[in-house]
Amino acid sequence: MHQTEAFAAGEEAEELRPSVESDKKEERILARRLRLAARKEAQTKQRLGEDDLGKEDVKEETRKSQKEVEHRERRMAKLKSDGLELVTNIQVAADARESDRRTELEEGHRLRREKLENEAKSSQEKFEEINRKWTDAKMKQTPLDLRDALSSQQQLCEQIIADKNKLISELQQELKASDDRYVKDLKRQAKDIDLLVERMEEQISTLKKSYREDLHQIENSLDEERRTLLTKHKKKWEHERKDRNEKELKNMMQSLSVMEEYADLLQKLRVQTAEEYNIDKIRMDTEVQKLRMKVQQTKFNCHMNEEKLDYKYEVLKKKEEENAIIKSQLKRKIIRMQDVLNNLKSKLTKQEKQSKAGNQSLSNDYTRISQQYKDMQKKARHFAALDAERLEKLWLMCEDEAKALTHRALETDRVIHEQQLGLEWASPPLPFMERSGAVQQKTFRTATQAAADTLKGEPEGGLDEDTAAGLNKRTVKSILELLCDEMGFLVESKLLMLLSPLEKNEQSLIKLDAIFSAIGIESEKDVYKMAEFFMNYRQHESKYTKDETANGQGESAEELSNLIHTEDLLAALKDFTAQFCRQDVHASHKSSILGLDMRDDSEDAAYWESIANVMPESKLKLWDALDTALNKYHAVLTERTELLMETQNIQQQNSELRQLLHLYTTSKAQ
């Protein structure tokens, strides 16, 4: 009866949308929940890009399925509230009875305490009276008086015992009444529990039935909405496709019109160029006429200069006579200077002897330092080989670990696609799986090695070949020799003293090494870049054509000076170092001096990046979305498991309570 009334009230409340401004607490809570659910759904759609309509106005009317879900949620909330009220009514009544029972029990305790206190007082008074009479009885001497006193004392004791027995009987009656009342309470509680279980089972069956109906209605509304959305999106797609076709046709027509405009513009430019050529020709003819007039003026100036020279010749004759006098004076001065010269020659002889001794000492030092340098090169190569071997081992270990992780990630992706999503899985391209070991190292020749090979080349055949940069070796050799001759100030004076006993090629090689160290040239590529820069420098300054530069590459050093003049060499070198050479070249120059191979690690980052990015960003987003959905599903399953276990425990407790109650009532009845 109560359940039917609650269901009817719920049907009436379903027509009203809950509001946060409602007077009822349940409706306000439900309205907040619905608003939070709608907000979370909108955020999820915006993050995953599932629905472009998520960016529309917030006041947009909710979908039909959402309305159906909200309607069913309000109905179920009302049904749960009514069912909970029916179940808790029994508990409220039991609590009220228990409160009354405890009140009566406290009142009975109070009355019993008062009775016990009154009886204790009266018993104490009677006991004191008995003690006083014993004192009086001891003072009596006749047996008759003693018998009367003893009888009186006996009556008083019997009266005390009678009062005690009366109190005990009253307490026993109350105890029996409490036992009877306890049995009645147990029976009443058993009836309440049965009624409670019956109402709970009835409520559970009603909720199950309502849940099934709501689920069926929600599924129907979702199917209908899905069909509507499919139809809507199909129409939208057709409309977009038509618009795209129209835009492509429009763009094609615009391209044709632009091509026609460009053709007209090209014809106009041709006509304009022809007109400019005619204007330039007229201007050049005018300049030629001006130059001819200038030549005539120059001839006139030459004639005037001849007359001036004749005048100066007469003046010089007079000066010659004066110079004869001065010459005689200078002869006397020369004699004095010869004496000074002889003294200086003797000093020079002594200085040469000292210089030879110093050179011999420096030569010995150079031999010793050269041997130390070779030993250091040998050790450096040894350690470089060890480092390369360690790098290869570490590379292979990291590569194996990365490939294992890649296989694991691909297997996980395959399981997700095939088992969780039901899609066909295709393996992405894995070019790094087909290779093993470090990225191939590139060995660069140092600038000193390239200079040594160039300077030692034979002119018959080796110098006529082209380098890897497309330059002629003869030209490169000429540039290096020009550097040795003109850039000697970059070499230390002590080093120049050590180079005097060496051959010319060795001197040039050591000078070039010092010059390269000073300007920051490290590799063979830098040498060829410098040579090309020098060849183009004079061309850039004098606006020579590239054909003249190409014809001059195979000529001698004298012809090279026409391309880069010795006076321009220092300026060209400054420009080259400012544009191409780095400021901090100490570390790389040290490795070039030791003769170590320089490893190109430019492709290492791309190689490891390709392994790290084997999974595209789209798949990672798919994994995150799937992980979130599975976590929610797991949370729902966990909650259902806990509820089932709790229900089973409650059922087991109810059955145990029924058995205990049945045993207790049976034992009381017996």
Curated annotation (Swiss-Prot):
Spell out the residue ranges making up region: Disordered: 1-26, 39-72
User: According to its UniProt record, which protein family does this protein belong to?
Assistant: Belongs to the DRC1 family.
Name the source organism. Danio rerio
Q: Where is the composition biased (Basic and acidic residues)?
A: 15-26
- GO BP annotations listed: axonemal dynein complex assembly; cilium-dependent cell motility; regulation of cilium movement
Extract the PANTHER family matched here.
DYNEIN REGULATORY COMPLEX PROTEIN 1, NYD-SP28 PROTEIN
Its main subcellular localisation, reduced to a broad class, is cytoplasm
Described purpose of this protein according to its UniProt entry: Component of the nexin-dynein regulatory complex (N-DRC) a key regulator of ciliary/flagellar motility which maintains the alignment and integrity of the distal axoneme and regulates microtubule sliding in motile axonemes. Plays a critical role in the assembly of N-DRC and also stabilizes the assembly of multiple inner dynein arms and radial spokes. Coassembles with CCDC65/DRC2 to form a central scaffold needed for assembly of the N-DRC and its attachment to the outer doublet microtubules.
Provide the alphabetized UniProt keywords: Cell projection, Cilium, Coiled coil, Cytoplasm, Cytoskeleton, Flagellum
Say if the entry is tagged with keyword Cytoplasm.
Answer: yes
Please give the subunit comment from the record. Answer: Component of the nexin-dynein regulatory complex (N-DRC).
Coiled-coil zones: 55-261, 326-382
Subcellular location(s): the record lists: Cytoplasm, Cytoskeleton, Cilium axoneme; Cytoplasm, Cytoskeleton, Flagellum axoneme
Q: Gene behind this chain?
A: drc1
Q: What is this protein called?
A: Dynein regulatory complex protein 1
Compositionally skewed regions (Low complexity) per UniProt: 1-10
